[in-house]
């Protein structure tokens, strides 16, 4: 019998073990689609970003005009820009669903995979932030000024750190140039880390909705999950098409259609919608350094989750109390997102502070206590 080339060729063998003959649990649901959707989002963003970079000029006197030029004069430039801008939003939708799936089904117990995932989230947020500055509109400029200025809260080194990032004494040409360099570079770093993320996942195999060992019931990735992923791809592409073609500015900020003016501050400085929850946590603390640390810990807390797991069961499927707290956390995130887009006045300040305390309390107190109590009532200890 002739040897199968996909199982013997050094390169094809890797592809085969990752995408074709990979043993996958037979009961993984649609929530396991988001990993591959994130891969698709990354490819879309790199391809559209590359074409945008061919026509973009990273100079404060030309950046805004070059984006206008892309939309008006470049063949399908408007479409490429709309796909890139809305693709970023869908990227965050997918990553938040992906993280929520991991929290609900206990996937965080694969510690290496989970921690690399958290680093990937940080890198994605950094990429989106520096990318938002590039069109050099009002919100680009003032968003960059406000967020980078937060680093000045760190004692002793703060002011030097801010000037080092700015490349001067204010957000200026040097800042835009380096942000463009970072925005071009970081997606490739994300790609490398994504490969390591998948590598670590395949050391253990996928988790499943029941949180049980599925070694006795595995099926091959192709054709079962390759077709299932293809359906997910189609859904995502339709959604992206609808957004880019019919509602391209739905998730954007109208203020960013005004060229950056250092002399005029916008009435409400706020980031893109996918950062609003973290921005609300930042604003809920009156102290500058405290706010910055809360902002950092709002993401870093995900790294603590594996160590706060007290339940004898992995998944939340059969744990009603944990489910209640999980959905409370989801609702809390939505409230924080809403508050992040509101002006700093009552009652929004108080709601934001309550939601911020709830956010950390759910992770650090409620969920570990729920796991411990469920062990007690089920006599699992």
Swiss-Prot record:
Q: Which domain of life is it from?
A: Eukaryota
Q: Where does a ubiquinone bind?
A: 202
Annotated GO CC locations: mitochondrial inner membrane; respiratory chain complex III
Q: Which GO terms describe its biological process?
A: mitochondrial electron transport, ubiquinol to cytochrome c
Q: Any idea which GO molecular function terms this record carries?
A: metal ion binding; ubiquinol-cytochrome-c reductase activity
Which PROSITE patterns does this UniProt record tie to the protein? CYTB_CTER, CYTB_NTER
Question: What stretches pass through the bilayer?
Answer: 34-54, 78-99, 114-134, 179-199, 227-247, 289-309, 321-341, 348-368
Could you identify this protein by its name? Cytochrome b
Which species? Isurus oxyrinchus (Shortfin mako shark)
């Amino acid at each position: 019998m002739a040897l199968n080339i996909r199982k013997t060729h050094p390169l094809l063998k890797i592809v085969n073990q990752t995408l074709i003959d990979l043993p996958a649990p037979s009961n993984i649901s649609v929530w396991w689609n988001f990993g591959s959707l994130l891969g698709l989002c990354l490819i879309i963003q790199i391809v559209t970003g590359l074409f945008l970079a061919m026509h973009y000029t990273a100079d404060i006197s030309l950046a805004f005009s070059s984006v206008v030029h892309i939309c008006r004069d470049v063949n399908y430039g408007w479409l490429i820009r709309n796909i890139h801008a809305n693709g970023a939003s869908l990227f965050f939708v997918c990553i938040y669903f992906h993280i929520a799936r991991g929290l609900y089904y206990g996937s965080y117990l694969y510690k290496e995979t989970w921690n690399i995932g958290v680093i990937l989230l940080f890198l994605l947020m950094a990429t989106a932030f520096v990318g938002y500055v590039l069109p050099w509109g009002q919100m680009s400029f003032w968003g960059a000024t406000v967020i980078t200025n937060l680093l000045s809260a760190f004692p002793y080194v703060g002011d030097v750190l801010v000037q080092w990032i700015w490349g001067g004494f204010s957000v200026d040409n040097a800042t835009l140039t380096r942000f463009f360099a970072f925005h071009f570079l970081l997606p490739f770093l994300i790609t490398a880390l994504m490969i390591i993320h998948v590598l670590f996942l395949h050391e253990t195999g996928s988790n499943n909705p029941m949180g049980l060992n599925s070694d006795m019931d595995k099926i091959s990735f192709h054709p079962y999950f390759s077709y299932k992923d293809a359906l997910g791809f189609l859904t995502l592409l339709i959604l992206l098409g609808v957004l880019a073609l019919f509602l391209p500015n739905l998730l954007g900020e109208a203020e960013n259609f005004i060229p950056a003016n250092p002399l005029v501050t916008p009435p409400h400085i706020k980031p893109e919608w996918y950062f609003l929850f973290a921005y609300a946590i930042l604003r809920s603390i009156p102290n500058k350094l405290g706010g910055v640390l809360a902002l950092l810990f709002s993401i870093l807390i995900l790294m603590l989750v594996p160590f706060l797991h007290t339940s004898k069961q992995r998944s939340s499927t059969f744990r009603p109390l944990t489910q209640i707290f999980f959905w409370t956390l989801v609702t809390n995130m939505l409230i924080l997102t809403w508050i992040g887009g509101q002006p700093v006045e009552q009652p929004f300040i108080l709601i934001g502070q309550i939601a911020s305390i709830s956010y950390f309390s759910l992770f650090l107190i409620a969920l570990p206590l729920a796991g411990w109590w469920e062990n007690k009532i089920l006599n699992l200890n």
